[in-house]
């Protein structure tokens, strides 16, 4: 089992290679997100990833790898599920506005709890099917 510092080091090094430099508070938020995900996953089966180290590389770093490609400031994550890629990207780019859309209530409940716990005020989790969703503003 990996400790928090090992995961933080893996995340810090990997995010730099992915082109999304995380400062220490952002790295800490990502590892907190991972712990929250694992706590919820025991009951709600949000992701099938086996170990935390794998989750860093398969989920967090994969999500962060698209950060340099994003244009604009308003983003929509359709089928947000367990929060990938939306939540890691929101941690990496906190000045942007993020809407995480999912049709399953348990996932949206997790996303809302994660946003509250991590104090991600630029993120809104919406419980809706994409074909029924009517945003009040356009996304970039």
Predicted regions and their residues:
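Conserved SAM/SAH cofactor-binding pocket of Class I
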Residues: 61-140
């Amino acid at each position: 089992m990996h400790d928090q510092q090992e995961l933080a080091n893996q995340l810090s090094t990997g995010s730099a290679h992915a082109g999304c430099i995380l400062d220490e508070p952002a790295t800490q938020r990502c590892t907190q997100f991972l712990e929250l995900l694992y706590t919820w996953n025991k009951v709600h089966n949000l992701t099938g990833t086996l170990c935390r180290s794998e989750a860093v590389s398969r989920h967090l770093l994969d999500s962060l790898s698209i950060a340099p490609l994003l244009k604009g400031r308003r983003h929509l994550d359709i089928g947000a599920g367990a929060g990938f890629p939306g939540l890691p990207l929101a941690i990496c780019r906190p000045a942007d506005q993020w809407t995480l859309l999912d049709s399953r209530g348990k996932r949206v409940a997790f996303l809302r709890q994660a946003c509250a716990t991590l104090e991600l005020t630029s993120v809104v989790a919406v419980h809706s099917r994409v074909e029924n969703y009517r945003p009040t503003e356009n996304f970039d």
